[in-house]
A protein has these predicted regions:
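Short amphipathic alpha-helix that is part of the acyltransferase structural core
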Residues: 1-59, 66-73, 140-163
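Short, solvent-exposed loop/edge-beta patches enriched in aromatic
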Residues: 46-51, 79-84, 101-105
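Active-site/acyl-donor-binding loops of N-acyltransferases
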Residues: 59, 122-142
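Short coil/turn motifs at secondary-structure junctions
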Residues: 60-62, 82, 115
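Hydrophobic, well-ordered secondary-structure scaffolds
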Residues: 72-73, 92-98, 104, 110-115
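Conserved acetyl-CoA-binding loop-helix of GNAT-fold acetyltransferases
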Residues: 76-79, 84-100
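Conserved active-site alpha-helix within GNAT-family acetyltransferase domains
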Residues: 102-106, 112-130
Length: 163
């Protein structure tokens, strides 16, 4: 068994593991592996030429305390069913977080299905997402106060304050 970054010749194996573990649409999987997937930032547990587990460390830049910081967004945490319960993910997560530090990143981020799985590794909930669904016609009762215009470069400072 070996824990390491993937090679480009293993892209299909990583993709197969993703489609096995997640219910994403084919369009999404195609988009992800064409536009986001980076074998140099994807760690795997491999045994006998077979990929058993994977963690993708997608690179992002975030603004924190007025500073732009590079970070790894942990996604695609996955293990084949027959390899679960053997400690592979614990080893892979520990090695991945070591690599985050080796990249001079102070922290990693993720949006887990169940945050309890990641507390062991030092992750904590920093915010919740509130989703409200409403019918667009319910917005009729709100009156427009002001006007709209297409944003330009001159509006950048104002937009930064809003977002």
């Amino acid at each position: 068994m070996e824990i390491r970054f993937t090679n480009t010749n293993e892209n299909q194996g990583v993709r197969d593991l993703w489609t096995y573990c997640f219910t994403d649409s084919q369009d999404y999987v195609d988009f992800y592996f064409k536009n986001k997937y980076n074998p140099e930032k994807t760690m795997v547990v491999e045994d006998g030429g077979r990929i058993l587990s994977a963690i993708h460390l997608n690179q992002h830049r975030v603004k924190l305390g007025g500073k732009d910081l590079d970070t790894s967004y942990v996604v695609g945490v996955s293990t084949l069913a027959e390899a679960r319960g053997m400690g592979f993910m614990a080893d892979l997560m520990s090695r991945s977080l070591y690599q985050v530090g080796a990249m001079d990143q102070s922290f990693a981020i993720l949006m887990p299905i169940d945050h309890r799985l990641y507390r062991t590794y030092g992750f904590e909930t920093c915010y919740d997402i509130l989703e409200i669904k409403l019918d667009i016609f319910d917005l009729k009762k709100f009156k427009l106060d002001g006007s709209f215009k297409r944003a330009s470069k001159e509006d950048a400072d104002d937009l930064v304050e809003v977002y």
